[in-house]
Amino acid sequence: MEKIPVLGLGTWQAAPGEVTEAVKVAIDTGYRHFDCAYLYHNENEVGVGIQAKIDEGVVRREDLFIVSKLWCTCHKKSLVKSACTRSLKALKLQYLDLYLIHWPMGFKPGEVDLPVDRSGMIVASNTDFLDTWEAMEDLVIEGLVRAIGVSNFNHEQLERLLNKPNLRVKPVTNQIECHPYLTQKKLISFCQSRNVSVTAYRPLGGSSEGVPLLEDPVIQTIAQKHGKSAAQILIRFQIQRNVIVIPKSVNPKRILENFQVFDFELSEQDMTDLLGLDRNLRLSAFPIAENHKDYPFKAEY
């Protein structure tokens, strides 16, 4: 597999009407890694942006690193390939560079993304992610995807996958929520010790939850010292931990700003101060799934 570019554009919560333009701006800026998922319901528009830049001759398909994710309602082995080809078709691609299991939990199959019972809790499927993984491996063998990985797996789940008998294709990354309020020190150290890279989603936190990470005084002070924005500090923080990072933006100015993180370095003290902000604050906790047998966040890490 090609090495995953360390910086990518996240497309989660990017409205279909604005994501095509965002992708085009990002490619012009220099982004080559795009993080997508069936769940985001905007892969079609992402694909339009990618295709436009290929047609213009700005990039070739082989210059790009495109990631998508298998949604929880498609964990049944017989559903994996059609889920993948659906994303490929939407993105207008012949292959994906990387395909991830979005969550370790299988949900009841069907058209509803979040099937819930009367009490509003997720309805599980009786699937096991080790079986789902075998269908993921088939996608690599068939050439539909170049590499496979996981997302939102805790270390016990990842260990179970890595120790699977007859594992044919290893997961290349574990994509997890990560920012200074949720530093994921133990999980990152575990993944890296097992040669599984880590990709950080929500690296800038999320003000929608009333958690204005970007306004944190410690981060602000470091930003002022370097003449950089708080967002640039948070992105650089992950890069210096050897963590791949996928900030989401549809704002052309911020798409550019988020990419300008290779011309400065955080000091050891900066890194220590940022790691010191950890408060185990998880923004993507998925509470309606917490009764699921494979819910990942009951384990310490």
Curated annotation (Swiss-Prot):
Residues holding NADP(+): 35, 175, 246-258
GO MF annotation: an example: 1,5-anhydro-D-fructose reductase activity
Chain residues that bind substrate: H102
Temperature dependence: Optimum temperature is 37 degrees Celsius.
Leading EC class: oxidoreductase
Site keyed Lowers pKa of active site Tyr: positions: K69
E.C. numbers: 1.1.1.263
UniProt-recorded name of the protein: 1,5-anhydro-D-fructose reductase
Active site per the UniProt annotation: Y40
Oligomer and partners: Monomer.
Recorded effect of pH on activity: Optimum pH is 7.0.
GO cellular component term, pick one: cytosol
Record field: catalytic activity: 1,5-anhydro-D-glucitol + NADP(+) = 1,5-anhydro-D-fructose + NADPH + H(+)
Domain of life: Eukaryota
Annotated family: Belongs to the aldo/keto reductase family.
